[in-house]
Amino acid sequence: MTEMIYEYDGSFEGFLTCIFESYAQKEVLTAISCGEDIPFTLFPVRTVLTDRDHAARVYRKVVKLSPEAADLLRRGFLTCLPDREMHLYRLVVKLLEEGPRFLRDLSDETLYPILRAVRHLNGEVHQYKGFVRFSDLGGVLGGEIEPKNRVLPLLRRHFCDRYRNERFFLYDRTHQEALFYAEGRSAVRPLEHFQMAPPDEAEARYRLLWKRFYDTIAIRERENPRCRMTHMPKRYWGTMTEFQGEAHFRARGTPAAVSGPGAPTAVSYTHL
């Protein structure tokens, strides 16, 4: 069998297509890379075009062998695990060759890194269900987050159910993508070079009121910074209203709106 590096488009369907191609072409993968992430190597590189039919065949096979493995595959692809494609590729190869029995061994060297990464992803999703702060941007609710993992697909149902009568978007600064929702329809789409517009006067007042409320209900004599950081890790503070400086509460635009290349079209919601 030939050793090969595959380049793909970064999508989950594209990754599954890579697995299909590796078996169809009888090639052993040494790396699966997206765009500029291709490592310097002496192995040949082949670009694999996404084929949804081939991807669906691979996924159906995984589900048939083990629904648990299929869930690990989907969630594992959303994690920040270094070289995650190769970890997941090895998981599928082992599943196809040995069956699902190894999934019971939590110390398995193929399984363990993925389990740990998925646990981290699930924890981050849980945290963001409580740590997202939305602002009123001219009739549209807008929020920003800075996750380590791609959490938006897993937060989608929670926020769409919670704000089903609103129009909103939630922007992931780390991965430059956003969740859009309006009138019962939602989509997670790429959104590069986005910058949230400053608040109008009404929104600025509400932000300030929230911060004052947060500061007022605090019991100074019982402050415990270490305990607070345990339950509310500091890396989440950058997008939370109650931890912002003066500039966050200064009105500069009337009304508030979304700004940034591609944003006006995306937030029109007509194409969801």
Where do the PLM segments sit?
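A generic structural motif
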Residues: 30-41, 169-176, 191
